[in-house]
């Protein structure tokens, strides 16, 4: 079963885009979307005041309420192999109850492996390979090495707790977190979605048609390249990020510490100011720069 929850650990909408791609390509029903085999009671988990669902106001009345849905769908990969997809908004509350409900699904459908997808914003350039953090509740499941050394204290998530609880209950679970350039974290970044699904293929032995995601990723990269070619100041910041990334990579290969490096690296504040303009240029017309890529 593949898990992708919206709301957290979804920089660049990587997990949400990946889930939508799976629904679109793995549906076995004529009307698309696959068969919903389990539905969670969202009222038990959702904080409507924190994440208000959109509604439509048509002149003098309300209509078109987009109710949040947290469901499990039966899908099929490119070779016809069946698998489940749990997707929807991350529960705001009652995480333990959510984990127990997922356990019921796992046992009811004899799920042998749960694979989660996520993404985090990182100070990395889009011109370098997307790094993936591998994690699992059973070390035998790991399909790659972790880029981290030692321990980190990080904010928890429902997906992370689910992996922990499933391990305690004797069920296998693993996941992948893509590192998305932080200046692209608010945009759809299909390149990260494709990287996540490539890892899902390896872990789950599914065959997923990634052609459409590849096309979308190439189009996004072309948009970014056009924007940077017309905005030298932002290009300079990306170049600084590349230098920072390569400095860390060299130090990692040589086993050196960066604490002794004399090379000045751009600060988060410096990058943030530049990337506010970057995001504005990609999302809409930039009056001060003569337009943005389409």
Regions found by a protein language model. Give the residues of each.
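Conserved active-site and cofactor/substrate-binding residues in soluble primary-metabolism enzymes
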Residues: 10-17, 93, 97, 157, ...
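A conserved C-terminal secondary-structure "cap"
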Residues: 184-294
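Internal, conserved structured core segments that host functional sites
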Residues: 81, 89-140, 162
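N-terminal short beta-loop-beta anion/metal-coordinating cradle
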Residues: 2-88
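Flexible, glycine/proline-enriched loop segments at strand-loop-helix junctions
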Residues: 5-9, 85-95, 145-153, 183-187
